[in-house]
Design a protein with these regions (language model features):
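Juxtamembrane transmembrane-helix termini in multi-pass membrane transport proteins
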Residues: 2-69, 124-143
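Hydrophobic/aromatic residues within the transmembrane alpha-helices of Major Facilitator Superfamily
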Residues: 13, 17, 50-51, 87, ...
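Hydrophobic alpha-helical transmembrane segments in multi-pass integral membrane proteins
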Residues: 53-58, 114-126, 183-193
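Selective transmembrane alpha-helices of multi-pass membrane proteins
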Residues: 65-94, 151-154, 158, 168-193
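Cytosolic-biased juxtamembrane loops and peripheral soluble domains of multi-pass membrane proteins
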Residues: 87-111
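Hydrophobic alpha-helical transmembrane segments of multi-pass membrane transport proteins
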Residues: 141-163
């Protein structure tokens, strides 16, 4: 079982650590507001993915992925939400003191349930790796907790990278707009995969 768990862990590290809509959004948050003000957003991202994993773990995900029309709607709603969330910082001129930023728990919690990349990685984790982890109870503990711990590390790191970039690039609005455009490009690319 240790080897099976290591396979899951490597998969999760690679999936969560690579650029995607959630990591780029949290990087924008870090660049705009710093790490500490985005803690709620990071916890929201982790909580949303935890819920998604539990839904898949109890079998509802397999049912939902068998509904192609629903998945198409999910993709477009997801893309629209992520573009909207990223674009909220387009004209923002405030730094970390900005009180009305959109990088809070309630915005973060719905990112992964609406994120097609999150659905694909969750489905793969449950179909390719979970069956080798023992009992359904063990699977329901290991898969969601592995994702949650890895997300806490990587989402915080992406947020910190955004904060560091903000310090290195004094033209904050230019940096923010560049990250927003990159996020939108990734979302549009993912939409047509």
């Amino acid at each position: 079982m240790i080897e099976s768990y290591l396979n899951l862990l490597i998969f999760v590290l690679l999936m969560v650590g690579t650029p995607g809509p959630a990591n780029l959004l949290v990087m924008i948050g870090g660049a705009r507001h710093g790490v500490l003000p985005c803690t709620g957003f990071i916890l929201g991202l982790v909580s949303g993915k935890l819920c998604l994993n539990i839904v898949f773990g109890v079998g509802l995900g397999i049912f939902l992925t068998g509904q192609p029309m629903m998945l198409q709607v999910l993709k477009f709603v997801s893309a629209g939400y992520m573009v909207w969330l990223a674009a909220q910082s387009w004209n923002s001129s405030g730094g970390s003191a900005s009180q009305n930023h959109q990088f809070r728990f309630k915005q973060g919690v719905i990112v992964h349930p609406l994120n097609p990349k999150a659905w694909v990685m969750t489905l793969l984790a449950w179909t390719q790796f979970a069956p080798e982890l023992g009992t359904p109870t063990m699977q329901l503990l290991l898969v969601p907790l592995t994702f949650a711990l890895v997300q806490l590390v990587f989402h915080t790191a992406w947020c910190a990278a955004g904060a560091l970039m903000q310090r290195a690039i004094p033209q904050q609005q230019l940096l923010t707009r560049g990250l927003i455009l990159l996020t939108i490009a990734v979302v549009v690319w993912a939409l047509f995969q």
